């Protein structure tokens, strides 16, 4: 029969095309590991490859964690490489990560196309352990710092954290002007423009969570979804995670929402001045209408911890909101059916309304700047750092975590109040301390850096006057600022206490190998007029020379 003969060349052509397409998926020599975003999901082309900057012709023109991909302009640009969930299938004889070293900080070995490669870690522990890094930023814990170092191809190390000793200066402008006043150039911790509000979408819908923050320098934004696992996935800008994309402006967009996507999405914004974390609740609803529940006893019962043993696995891909006593608010839990009914709420708002009594803890709210232009200096409490910090309020649409002074903030919020430290007892009185010291200065603290591991730190002092200087030549050199090393400091109750007060201090200490040093026996007191006058009189009368003669 002559009719079937054309099928043979068609079949051959199909096999050839199939083999060609499979060959194109193999990595080219010298190419970077991973895939272009559109190779994983064509729906996210615009979100991931909308930039037409950073042109390239091959992967070698990009950073090690990037691919050279076609952009929307018809050219090619460097884009963060994507990896499918679980990575590509590899044969049983694939290479292992044994004896394979990843020199980059924050990277781990992974297998890609049968070869060991280094990938930046993207999951970190949920427990906070705030870490100040050499790039001037504060990280939630050290894992976050290592992950950021890998992403940027840097080496970061831990440095002492800085204290904010007073309100940063600002320039509000004269009252008669109508131009928008600009805050001063001092670093400012991150603050939200608007308060996070719960969102609810139906299955298959799209949700957009915008972590719109201010701060100086501009804060870096990451996202993570809260879970009951030990580690959370860190989601960074300009990257795709399944059906979730984080845009370059820190906006999280979730496509084709499913029931299991419901939960608390936490935005973390950080800069050199501080750290902010804000929860954005997202509920995903089934399109089928559900019967309204009795908001009375049944709702109250569902707020209680579920102590009843349930037979069988949880409902597949279904989560409900329940009150979490540890968080003090509602969170998602896998839906368990006991006696034919799943305990919990379909939305975050319904759970909060039924289970959370009272207005809630204002100190747990993130600082909100607001969208207006009437700049005012305010204070907000950070539950992460457990201290009050300054921020700039625009004059409208804020929240209750907004105080006019540091004192009112500390009175309203749970600032750790350890038993009061005993007053630092001086080993010697003023005259004897002056004679035993190598220097005596009057100055104002501008910065204090703690080094708890070394039981020390550094204090930077703006000099008002040099009363005595035997070894450093401060007056001769015209020194305006002095860096003093703090030795043997117990930062729980530091002596001498260099962390209190904004006024001038009288500081006396030793000079060791050309470095000014303060220890527990050093003299540090407020620079009252009477005290400074007494020191000047002792020096003019050469009291120290007389004292040395008597001791000899």
UniProtKB/Swiss-Prot annotation:
One of its GO terms (molecular function) is receptor antagonist activity. The record marks 126-127 as: Reactive bond. The second BPTI/Kunitz inhibitor domain is able to inhibit trypsin. It has however no activity toward chymotrypsin, elastase, plasmin, pancreatic kallikrein, lung tryptase, plasma kallikrein, thrombin, urokinase or tissue plasminogen activator. Keywords: Disulfide bond, Glycoprotein, Immunoglobulin domain, Metalloenzyme inhibitor, Metalloprotease inhibitor, Protease inhibitor, Repeat, Secreted, Serine protease inhibitor, Signal. It comes from the Eukaryota. GO terms for cellular component: extracellular region; extracellular space. Residues 190-283 form the Ig-like C2-type domain. It is found in: Secreted. Its main location: secreted. This is WAP, Kazal, immunoglobulin, Kunitz and NTR domain-containing protein 1. Disulfide bonds join 36-69, 52-73, 56-68, 62-78, 120-150, 124-143, 132-161, 211-267, 303-355, 310-338, 330-351, 363-413, 372-396, 388-409, 421-493, 424-495, 435-544. PROSITE patterns: BPTI_KUNITZ_1, BPTI_KUNITZ_2, IG_LIKE, KAZAL_2, NTR, WAP. Belongs to the WFIKKN family. The keyword Secreted applies. It comes from Rattus norvegicus (Rat). Residues 1-25 form the signal peptide. InterPro entries: Elafin-like_sf (IPR036645), Ig-like_dom (IPR007110), Ig-like_dom_sf (IPR036179), Ig-like_fold (IPR013783), Ig_sub (IPR003599), Ig_sub2 (IPR003598), Kazal_dom (IPR002350), Kazal_dom_sf (IPR036058).
